[in-house]
Amino acid sequence: GSGVTFTVDQPPTTRVAPLDEYAEKVVRARRRGLVYPYELVSMVAGSGGSVQELDLDESGRLVPVERPYGENTAGLICGLVTTPTPLHPEGVSRVLLCGDPLRALGAVAEPECARVIAALDLAEEWGLPVEWFALSAGARISMDSGTENMDWVAKALKRIIEFTQAGHEINVVVAGINVGAQPYWNAEATMLMHTKGILVMTPDSAMVLTGKQSLDFSGGVSAEDNFGI
């Protein structure tokens, strides 16, 4: 799964087709050492499984959407995953959440927090667990938004606590750098005494409350990179 490989083949006789928009996003993610969320679909669903992408409707509920992969409008991708098993041939279903590293490194504001809340509402309504591949730079910081982003982060955090206290399950896979709000969400979802879910950290993942750039700009003591913090 790592290293450089190459093959020798006959030169092509036709023009090389340019990459489409989706392929460009996959390549951009790989250049950063990340996996584009839609590439996780086959792995998460498993052999014979299925994934239905979900997005918000006008009323704020998650509903199935039919669109090409990569056309998400927020930094969080939602879906419904079903995987058949020998014990459950009809399939085991769960609600899927994936942070999009190509949208401000998964920074969260109202669009992302609203999807977290809607996903937990859907999972509670259907009695399903949540699988969350977490990758996020924390609350969005920009010139056109302010503390309302933190208000939405707190609202999503409250919903996570209510969801787990009601006996429901969130399983978190830390799939990269998690900064600020996301580690708080991860902890509240999996680390309290009443929670049922697990927290899995991949080798190249990290959970930090403040990122390297923020510490540098504020005059604080940081490290060589976010993993060092």
Model feature map: region roles:
Residues 102-111, 143-149:
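Flexible beta-alpha connector loops of hexameric P-loop NTPases
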Residues 23, 30, 45-51, 55-58, ...:
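Structural signal for hydrophobic packing residues in well-ordered secondary-structure cores
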Residues 61-73, 105-108, 197-213:
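Short charge-dense sequence patches
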Residues 72-77, 104-121:
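Glycine-rich anion/phosphate-binding loops
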Residues 83-100, 114-144:
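A structural preference for short, pocket-lining loop segments at secondary-structure junctions
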Residues 57-61, 72-76, 110-111, 149-152, ...:
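A short linear-motif detector with a strong N-terminal bias
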Residues 1-94, 98-104:
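Intrinsically disordered, low-complexity segments enriched in small/flexible residues
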